[in-house]
A protein has these predicted regions:
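Non-catalytic, C-terminal membrane-associated alpha-helical segments of glycosyltransferases
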Residues: 1-17, 283-351, 358, 379, ...
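N-proximal low-complexity "stem/linker" segments adjacent to membrane-targeting elements
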Residues: 2-58
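Acidic/His-rich active-site region of diverse nucleotide-sugar glycosyltransferases
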Residues: 14, 105, 111, 125-126, ...
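Short, acidic, metal-binding catalytic loop of nucleotide-sugar glycosyltransferases
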Residues: 57-66
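A conserved acidic beta->alpha catalytic loop
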Residues: 58, 73-82, 98
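Glycine-rich, basic loop-to-helix element that forms the pyrophosphate-binding segment
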Residues: 96-113, 123
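Short aromatic/hydrophobic "clamp" motif used to bind/position activated sugar donors
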Residues: 118
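A short, conserved alpha-helix in the catalytic core of glycosyltransferases
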Residues: 193-211, 216-245
């Protein structure tokens, strides 16, 4: 274990390096020709035959007619490719003899995908019926939606470490800066910072505009946060979909190749990499960076040794038009969305002391009720903006000016 002096040196170097981070880049990419409507399921798998066997039947049953499954079999010696060819001939196999990082594996699948939407699905996820329908429906409700992400449950008796409702918030300053909040009964289509790369549906064209997953995040973790954040910078949101449910056998692959302490350090290093590579606003970057390295020093976390080099090698790759502090307020754990029962009525955005299921009488008078924790005016303003942009259920308009008719009752 390094001594206190060594941690102090690493910390000082990291603080100085934050001022040397390269400026954000402006990059344009072509989206390519329009893809046919449908879903391409991309499943990265390493030595995963035993995980795929119980997963694939549910996926095949639930997929719509216009769909395909691509398994990216990488670094396997368990006969996965031959088994798929014999037992699941409808499944396409993208083969790599060498093991790939998560980002590299899914990017191979994304490149091969031919439909309008791409579902990234870990091989340790078991989907429940209606999974694909619920995710796809979100894109009919929300214009320019980037990602719809599923509700994540864990097997009985296993502590729930993920929920799908990802926010940037800390209960304590030494907590990891990203957490998953417990969904509220009746909550659906709440904005989230990003969708889990293990159970989310993406707009394939927008995903390609962003260059897919950033392969700097090796071997795994935080690449999904990175791409979701970069999408928000362009005004392309992600939402939590309560009706799309998966059961997750947590770290069924990574735990075979890395110890828990190694995985924890990979997560911390890649979070630093995310700050350096994704956060474009320089003032916001320096604040989040300082918070992160101060936290690592207090925890005496070895990830701090990498911080200075990560900052200097960084430089945000996107510089979109949508203010970062605005979408961080919207996805900071202070907002919850509840579908109403009157589709013809206007939505409602209001402050609340507690985020809890609204009474049925209120839901019956609105197409949607959005609760914002009292006092967070930036989140309230962002919620008004985004709620006004949603389409009514069944309205498939591709353009036009969204309705902004939103009542704002005074806080009592």
């Amino acid at each position: 274990m390094p001594d206190a002096f060594q941690f102090a040196v690493w910390h000082l170097a990291a603080r100085a390096a934050a001022w040397l981070r390269p400026p954000a880049l402006m990059r344009g990419r072509e989206t390519g020709p329009a893809a046919p409507s449908g879903i391409s399921v991309v499943i990265p798998s390493r030595q995963g035959r035993q995980l795929l066997a119980p997963q694939l039947p549910g996926v095949l049953r639930d997929l719509p007619e216009d769909a395909e499954i691509i398994v990216v079999d990488n670094g396997s010696s368990d006969g996965t490719a031959a088994w798929l060819a014999a037992e699941w001939p409808m499944v396409q196999v993208e083969l790599s003899a060498d093991p790939l990082s998560f980002a590299a594996a899914v990017n191979r699948g994304i490149t091969r995908a031919r439909f309008s939407h791409v579902c990234l699905l870990n091989n340790d996820m078991l989907i429940e019926p209606g999974f694909f329908t619920a995710l796809r429906r979100a894109f009919d409700r929300i214009p320019v939606l980037f990602c719809a992400t599923a509700q994540i449950r864990f097997p009985a008796g296993v502590r729930r470490e993920e929920t799908g409702k990802a926010v940037m918030a800390q209960a304590h300053r030494d907590d990891f800066p990203i957490r998953c909040d417990e969904p509220i009964a009746g909550e659906d289509l709440t904005w989230v910072l990003y969708g889990s790369g293990g159970c989310s549906l993406y707009d394939a064209a927008l995903l390609r505009v962003l260059g897919g997953m950033d392969e700097a995040y090796a071997p795994a973790y935080v690449e999904d946060l990175d791409v979701g954040y970069r999408a928000w910078q362009h005004g392309w949101p992600s939402v939590y979909v309560a009706g799309a449910v998966v059961e997750h056998r947590h770290r069924a692959t990574t735990s075979r190749y890395f110890r828990e302490l190694e995985l924890a350090e990979i997560l911390e290093v890649n979070y630093l990499r995310f700050l350096a590579r994704a956060v474009a606003d320089r003032r916001l970057f320096r604040k989040l960076w300082t918070d992160a390295i101060d936290r690592l020093r207090r925890r005496r976390d070895g990830a701090l040794r990498n911080a200075a080099a990560i900052a200097i090698e960084g430089g945000a790759r996107e510089h979109g038009h949508y203010p970062e502090e605005r979408f961080l307020a919207l996805t900071g754990g202070d907002v919850a969305v509840f579908p109403g029962t009157d589709e013809s009525a206007p939505p409602l955005v209001e402050f609340a002391e507690r985020l809890d299921t609204p009474p049925q009488t209120k839901l019956a008078r609105h197409s949607e009720v959005v609760l914002v924790r009292s006092g967070n005016e930036l989140a309230r303003d962002a919620a008004i903006e985004w709620t006004g942009g949603k389409q009514p259920v069944g309205d498939k308009r591709a353009g036009g000016t969204p309705s902004r008719e939103i009542r704002l009752p005074r806080e009592s």
